[in-house]
Amino acid sequence: MGAPACALALCVAVAIVAGASSESLGTEQRVVGRAAEVPGPEPGQQEQLVFGSGDAVELSCPPPGGGPMGPTVWVKDGTGLVPSERVLVGPQRLQVLNASHEDSGAYSCRQRLTQRVLCHFSVRVTDAPSSGDDEDGEDEAEDTGVDTGAPYWTRPERMDKKLLAVPAANTVRFRCPAAGNPTPSISWLKNGREFRGEHRIGGIKLRHQQWSLVMESVVPSDRGNYTCVVENKFGSIRQTYTLDVLERSPHRPILQAGLPANQTAVLGSDVEFHCKVYSDAQPHIQWLKHVEVNGSKVGPDGTPYVTVLKTAGANTTDKELEVLSLHNVTFEDAGEYTCLAGNSIGFSHHSAWLVVLPAEEELVEADEAGSVYAGILSYGVGFFLFILVVAAVTLCRLRSPPKKGLGSPTVHKISRFPLKRQVSLESNASMSSNTPLVRIARLSSGEGPTLANVSELELPADPKWELSRARLTLGKPLGEGCFGQVVMAEAIGIDKDRAAKPVTVAVKMLKDDATDKDLSDLVSEMEMMKMIGKHKNIINLLGACTQGGPLYVLVEYAAKGNLREFLRARRPPGLDYSFDTCKPPEEQLTFKDLVSCAYQVARGMEYLASQKCIHRDLAARNVLVTEDNVMKIADFGLARDVHNLDYYKKTTNGRLPVKWMAPEALFDRVYTHQSDVWSFGVLLWEIFTLGGSPYPGIPVEELFKLLKEGHRMDKPANCTHDLYMIMRECWHAAPSQRPTFKQLVEDLDRVLTVTSTDEYLDLSAPFEQYSPGGQDTPSSSSSGDDSVFAHDLLPPAPPSSGGSRT
């Protein structure tokens, strides 16, 4: 035993010498935090730390100089700390969870053998402000014993997360905990500019004691860079955070797969069904049990008979509603149970079965009797499945086409693209159940995510729409669309009456760097146009080239471009509001021409509504004009991912799509035919201002506030009172009170009938100011004569030409 004892004594001596020698080594500055751990202060120096009530106090004390430091003990106010559920003691780290005033005091980390102090901290736990009101922070300015100096961060490890992404409507808090002597001040910048409460709808909360900025109910316009500036007379420091606000998903509730799960219970036991619901909009949850009425589980209309077991009450929470508890189950409790969850978009449901078994002693007898039958049944089912597999393989071989020649390209990847169906049905409809699928085989030697160099795509041929590539001659580019480029072309065989005569068409095709999603979207748009059918006032599908090369989608060509530029090009010449003073003016428009434009667009939207299609982006820029001045609505078949569209930022040419959106679409992402009617009212305003920009000079943040307060745009100069009343009805705050497109067609037809053909526009009337760059000029939001707003929420009297609403 002599040798082991000597070795143990030698180890202890080495540890003591190493601890003593470490006193002479330099140390780095220590940082307190929940995540990062860095060296602590030099022995003898006391670190002053301030924590909020309820925070986790975490003290870190690495070995000085990085060497060994042996066993340690943590001491508070001279008394050793005893580990507990709230006090977590480690060799180099101490955590005190849910801190309170009693946890304030002097903490130190000491070597157990020598009692040498390795790190020393002074901790003070303060109350967080009880409300969001601004605090003056004077109680933070007392002398803390720290030497006079520039500001510094006290909790830098809590500031590591510089990018914050949160869903809309959440509360965001940025913190910059700092100290200095004298106590520094803190100010906030957004995108490099001073940020105050009046700069944001809903305001902000500045909690100086917490060195924090709080924003409640964030919206996408709150995106940006937020910088805290902490300074005193000796210096300043700053930290920048980036905030990204994620759009609310316009989707019916999503239920977690596999829940509720089937249950098997013994008579008299307790059972719980669980249903996990995910929904951005507030969900409503119910638990249902399927029952029989007169021996039938469904009614004459196919609706199942159910009993509501659990639903929302005054004091129930969503978490409570996600669990259905059944106590002391009986045989009558066996059956099908459904979790039904709904929101403003639609409904989702999952079902599960409960099987109730007799008591355990009865089960033993049943098992013995049933084991023989189970064995026979399993062998029989296995043999039957084997026969089915053999028959299926044989049938597939007989029906399979002959293999391609050696010169044919190899199919490297087959993708099954779910096509986003733009025919948006009523809010309770299941979009997924009606989603068409098109099987697409990519023929290429590449395996990358793009479709570059793809010479051929295998799409199922549709004889009704397929056009031979030999009959198509591509021409000049017309522009770039969502999925690729659009070119002019001449097609032979489009007009069945004159099959040999070439017809000018527009061809949509993918760009060279297109992705699989771009292909899916273009195919989706094509399929949507097939389903919606033809109408004079929409852009119609003419054909497609899907075989033997790139995908080409042929649509009608509109020679005069979009309605917005069509109107601007026909503004009276010689004035500063004309679209292009260097270009000869086009034909002058009469008042009846403008009413005709509106009437035709209403006709097109009436047809789309009858086909259950919601446009979601109706504006003059999405209406095209043919050579014969026929209005055609475009882009109604686009597979828009509406919760990813950034409607809160300017587009490249300065337009703000929020200005066409109904309040329920803008704030809640609810799109209906009624929200399209609101957009139609804005389009009417565009028409009668000859392509004016809605709400000129109004910042987006102020627009939100003004719309909520009921402000609406004033009557355009070249618009009658009756037409303005139609606009105002389209802008009713309640979607159900807005006219339908069928009613709008009737109203505009009535106005068109009584309008004189020779009634030209008043050239002396002022138009909305427009600059080719699309930048809005600053203007007042007051309600004066030049304001673009009117204050009354509803018109004082119904339009004389509008008729009654039903």
Swiss-Prot record:
Outcome of mutating residue 79 to S: In a lung adenocarcinoma sample; somatic mutation
GO molecular function, one term: fibroblast growth factor receptor activity
Extracellular side: 23-375
Cytoplasmic topological segments: 397-806
Variant or mutagenesis effect after changing residue 540 to T: In hypochondroplasia
Catalytic residues identified in the record: 617 (proton acceptor)
Disulfide pairings: 61-109, 176-228, 275-339
Pfam family, one: I-set
Record protein name field: Fibroblast growth factor receptor 3
Chain's gene name: FGFR3
